A protein has these predicted regions:
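N-terminal metal-binding scaffold of metallo-dependent hydrolase/deaminase domains
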Residues: 1-43, 56-57
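Conserved beta-strand scaffold positions in the cores of enzyme catalytic domains, especially
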Residues: 4, 46-50, 145
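Divalent metal-coordination and catalytic microenvironments
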Residues: 8, 25, 30, 53, ...
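Conserved residues at the C-terminal ends of beta-strands
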Residues: 11, 119, 189
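Glycine/Thr-rich phosphate-binding loops of Rossmann-like dinucleotide-binding domains
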Residues: 35-36, 70-71, 126, 153, ...
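Short amphipathic alpha-helices and their capping/turn segments at secondary-structure boundaries
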Residues: 44-55, 126-137, 170-182
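Metal-associated gating/positioning segment near the N- to mid-region
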Residues: 55-132
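Metal-coordinating catalytic core of metallo-dependent amide/deamination hydrolases
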Residues: 137-197
Length: 197
C-alpha cells in the first residue's frame, strides 16, 4: 500500500535537523520514495495520513541490544550465569522469558526504534523473534540477530548471553550452531566488558 503523510513537522535525522513543514512524505511498499511540497501533491494513488502538526521522523536504529534485559541499570549485583541457567532449565521459565524478550522488543518499537541489532541473548530467542516479526505474527522492530555471543572462560557475559568456548573446536561448534540458527551476525565477547562508573 502507498501512503502520503502530510501536515507534519518533519525531523530528517541530519546533523542540523531543522524542522521542515509544508512537505508531504510519500511511502510506497514500506519505502520512503519522495518528499514533495504539500500544496502541489497529487495523492490520488495514496492513502493520506494527516499528521495534524505532529512530529514525524525516520525510524531509529539501536545497534547494541540484549533483549534478555530491559536496559535499565541493575539495582544490585546478581549472578547472571545462575539466573540464565535457571531460566533456560524448564519449558515454563523459557516461555515466560521469551514473552519478556518479545515485550522488550515491542518497547523498542513503541519508542521509535524500527531496527535493532542484538548482540548476545538467550538461546535462539532473537532469531525466533526476528522470524515471527517478519512473518507478522509478533509486533516489533526489524531484528539483526546474533543469538548467544561467543566468549571465552571467564570472558565478558560468558554463561549468560554468551557461550564460553575453551578451544578452537568449541568455537567452531558454536559457529556451526549459529549457522544452523540462521543468525545475521556473530558477536564475539572475548575481552571483559568496559563499564564506566
Amino acid at each position: 500500500m502507498n501512503y502520503a503523510f502530510r501536515n507534519g513537522k518533519i525531523l530528517d535525522g541530519t546533523k542540523e535537523m531543522k524542522i521542515q513543514q509544508g512537505l508531504c512524505i510519500l511511502v510506497e511498499n514500506g519505502i520512503i520514495t519522495d518528499l514533495i511540497p504539500d500544496a502541489n501533491a497529487d495523492l490520488h494513488n495514496y492513502k493520506v495520513i494527516d499528521l495534524h502538526g505532529q512530529y514525524i521522523l525516520p525510524g531509529l536504529i539501536n545497534m547494541h541490544v540484549h533483549l534478555a534485559g530491559n536496559g535499565k541499570p541493575q539495582k544490585k549485583q546478581r549472578d547472571n550465569e545462575k539466573l540464565v541457567k535457571t531460566i533456560m532449565s524448564s519449558s515454563l521459565t523459557r516461555t515466560i522469558a521469551y514473552k519478556m524478550v518479545a515485550g522488550f522488543a515491542k518497547d523498542e518499537l513503541f519508542s521509535g526504534v524500527t531496527t535493532i541489532r542484538t548482540v548476545g541473548g538467550l538461546g535462539n530467542f532473537d532469531t525466533r523473534l526476528r522470524d515471527e516479526i517478519e512473518s507478522g505474527t509478533k509486533l516489533g522492530p526489524g531484528i539483526l540477530a546474533a543469538n548467544q555471543g561467543i566468549s571465552v572462560p571467564g570472558g565478558h557475559m560468558a554463561g549468560s548471553v554468551a557461550v564460553a568456548a575453551s578451544t578452537i573446536p568449541d568455537a567452531l561448534k558454536q559457529l556451526e550452531k549459529a549457522k544452523q540458527e540462521k543468525v545475521d551476525l556473530i558477536k564475539l565477547m572475548i575481552t571483559g566488558g568496559v563499564l564506566f562508573c
